[in-house]
Amino acid sequence: MTYLQESSRPAVTVPKLQAMRDAGEKIAMLTCYDASFSALLDRSGVDVLLIGDSLGNVLQGHTTTLPVSLDDIAYHTACVARAQPRALIMADLPFGTYGTPAEAFASSVKLMRAGAQMVKLEGGEWLAETIRFLVERAVPVCAHVGLTPQSVHAFGGFKVQGKTEAGAAQLLRDARAVEAAGAQVVLLEAVPTLIGSEVTHMLRVPTIGIGAGADCSGQVLVLHDMLGVFPGKRPRFVKDFMQGEPNIQAAVEAYVRAVKDGSFPGPEHSF
């Protein structure tokens, strides 16, 4: 059995994401951890596959993403890459692997050698030097601001960010700083819709939202969440796309359509 894709679909590249943003075409992104789903998601039209440290939750059973190692992410990145998807492959830098610019570069090199085409790291203003260091060394970067799950203990839980005047001002500073440092994509998690919209219109680079409103340049969900595979209470920003669909591919295609036509997220999935 082979998972190699034979597709005439043009490859999604970092410049392509910018072109999509500039043309007003929404970007559909999902997490992915293995070759089988890499092939299926690519067939279904997903633009970006994220090997997220969310694997610590949905695959390893941890309550936070903190235990996930760089080796874990590299292993799953290699699995996803073996299917040779046309979608862009983005990989998370786990907690504790980018404390200095040099450490971030070494970690990024390992993930890019495994097949990643872009790395994602969590943080705002304080990461500007690191982002600049990576971009100068040909490492494409997605900066993750707002609710950053690796900071769960500092936040005191998984809480919406930017609800206060001071918090909103900090989010705007973070977004400006990471773009100025060279981040090619900014991911916004769990922020009020108005803030997501303001950041999206303020920046030139694409924004990807998860609980950040419909105005973002694109959307991302954890694969297991959008397929209805989650224990306990469903996060507000999640929609179960398996409902009413005959199979997983149909559910993923429904997600892609909903992102592309702007019907997801709705107000019920936003803050």
From Swiss-Prot:
GO CC, alphabetical: cytoplasm
Catalysed conversion reaction: 3-methyl-2-oxobutanoate + (6R)-5,10-methylene-5,6,7,8-tetrahydrofolate + H2O = 2-dehydropantoate + (6S)-5,6,7,8-tetrahydrofolate
Name of the featured protein: 3-methyl-2-oxobutanoate hydroxymethyltransferase 2
This protein's pathway: Cofactor biosynthesis; (R)-pantothenate biosynthesis; (R)-pantoate from 3-methyl-2-oxobutanoate: step 1/2
Main localization, broad class: cytoplasm
Assembly mode: Homodecamer; pentamer of dimers.
Cited CDD domains: KPHMT-like
Needed co-factor(s): Mg(2+)
Subcellular location: Cytoplasm
InterPro entries the UniProt entry points to: Pantoate_hydroxy_MeTrfase (IPR003700), Pyrv/PenolPyrv_kinase-like_dom (IPR015813), Pyrv_kinase-like_dom_sf (IPR040442)
Active site: E189
GO MF term set: 3-methyl-2-oxobutanoate hydroxymethyltransferase activity; magnesium ion binding
Organism of derivation: Burkholderia lata (strain ATCC 17760 / DSM 23089 / LMG 22485 / NCIMB 9086 / R18194 / 383)
Gene Ontology biological-process annotations: pantothenate biosynthetic process
Superkingdom per UniProt: Bacteria
Pfam families in alphabetical order: Pantoate_transf (PF02548)
Record's cofactor remark: Binds 1 Mg(2+) ion per subunit.
Binding-site positions, Mg(2+): D53, D92, E122
